[in-house]
């Protein structure tokens, strides 16, 4: 990168560095009731079935999807 390019980029980003970044004021309360073991197991199982099972199916049948040459 040339010196001129770095000076131009520094000039463009220099003013953006001085702007104040607004902070979100997020406050939350503790949960009214804790999740039980059964709810956690159902959530993990549904995530597994939703994401990992189709990916595993595609990876295990990858040879079937290839074009014959």
UniProtKB/Swiss-Prot annotation:
Transit peptide: 1-25
A GO CC term attached to the entry: mitochondrial inner membrane
Sorted UniProt keywords: Membrane, Mitochondrion, Mitochondrion inner membrane, Transit peptide, Transmembrane, Transmembrane helix, Ubl conjugation
Keyword flag Transmembrane helix: yes
Topological domain ranges for the Mitochondrial intermembrane compartment: 61-69
Membrane topology per record: Single-pass membrane protein
Topological domain spans for side Mitochondrial matrix: 26-36
Xref: Pfam families: COX8
Pathway(s) of this molecule: Energy metabolism; oxidative phosphorylation
Domain of life from the UniProt record: Eukaryota
Modification after translation (UniProt): In response to mitochondrial stress, the precursor protein is ubiquitinated by the SIFI complex in the cytoplasm before mitochondrial import, leading to its degradation. Within the SIFI complex, UBR4 initiates ubiquitin chain that are further elongated or branched by KCMF1.
Motif SIFI-degron: where in chain: 2-19
GO biological process terms, semicolon-separated: mitochondrial electron transport, cytochrome c to oxygen
InterPro entries attached to this UniProt entry: Cyt_c_oxidase_su8, Cyt_c_oxidase_su8_sf
Segments traversing the membrane: 37-60
Signal sequence, start to end: none
Subcellular location: Mitochondrion inner membrane
Subunit structure: Component of the cytochrome c oxidase (complex IV, CIV), a multisubunit enzyme composed of 14 subunits. The complex is composed of a catalytic core of 3 subunits MT-CO1, MT-CO2 and MT-CO3, encoded in the mitochondrial DNA, and 11 supernumerary subunits COX4I, COX5A, COX5B, COX6A, COX6B, COX6C, COX7A, COX7B, COX7C, COX8 and NDUFA4, which are encoded in the nuclear genome.
Family the entry assigns: Belongs to the cytochrome c oxidase VIII family.
Entry function: Component of the cytochrome c oxidase, the last enzyme in the mitochondrial electron transport chain which drives oxidative phosphorylation. The respiratory chain contains 3 multisubunit complexes succinate dehydrogenase (complex II, CII), ubiquinol-cytochrome c oxidoreductase (cytochrome b-c1 complex, complex III, CIII) and cytochrome c oxidase (complex IV, CIV), that cooperate to transfer electrons derived from NADH and succinate to molecular oxygen, creating an electrochemical gradient over the inner membrane that drives transmembrane transport and the ATP synthase.
Protein name as it appears in the record: Cytochrome c oxidase subunit 8A, mitochondrial
Species in which this protein is naturally found: Trachypithecus cristatus
Gene that encodes the chain: COX8A
């Amino acid at each position: 990168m040339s010196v001129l390019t770095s000076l131009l980029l520094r000039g463009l980003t220099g003013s953006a560095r001085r702007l104040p970044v607004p902070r979100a004021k997020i406050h939350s309360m503790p949960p009214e009731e804790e999740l039980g073991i059964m709810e956690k197991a159902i959530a993990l199982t549904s995530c597994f079935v939703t994401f990992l099972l189709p990916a595993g199916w595609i990876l295990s049948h990858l040879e079937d999807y290839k074009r014959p040459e």
